[in-house]
UniProtKB/Swiss-Prot annotation:
Gene from which the chain derives: rpsR
Entry-linked InterPro entries: Ribosomal_bS18, Ribosomal_bS18_CS, Ribosomal_bS18_sf
Family matches, as Gene3D superfamilies: Ribosomal protein S18
Function according to Swiss-Prot or TrEMBL: Binds as a heterodimer with protein bS6 to the central domain of the 16S rRNA, where it helps stabilize the platform of the 30S subunit.
Entry's Gene Ontology molecular function annotations: small ribosomal subunit rRNA binding; structural constituent of ribosome
GO biological process, one term: translation
Annotated protein name in UniProt: Small ribosomal subunit protein bS18
Organism superkingdom: Bacteria
Pfam families the UniProt entry points to: Ribosomal_S18 (PF01084)
Amino acid sequence: MPRPTGKKFDKRRQQQNPLFKRKKFCRFTAAGVEQIDYKDIDTLKDFIGENGKITPARLTGTKAHYQRQLDTAIKRARFLALMPYTDQHKA
């Protein structure tokens, strides 16, 4: 049986593709941030996964300069007990 082809099929296939890549951009460059602050916990939480790991720049689209600052800010916030090192523990 031949595979379905045509304009309609291609459009539907693109919409259903779970790996469809959206154009990534650096949030910090767009906002004009010069320095990432370790006290801004709400921003830092966006860059930490469910398991407590720092999300890599290739997934978030953050530029290398800001990714290094982000890494340092998260580590400082963890050291000062502003953020947890791991996810929520189930007792």
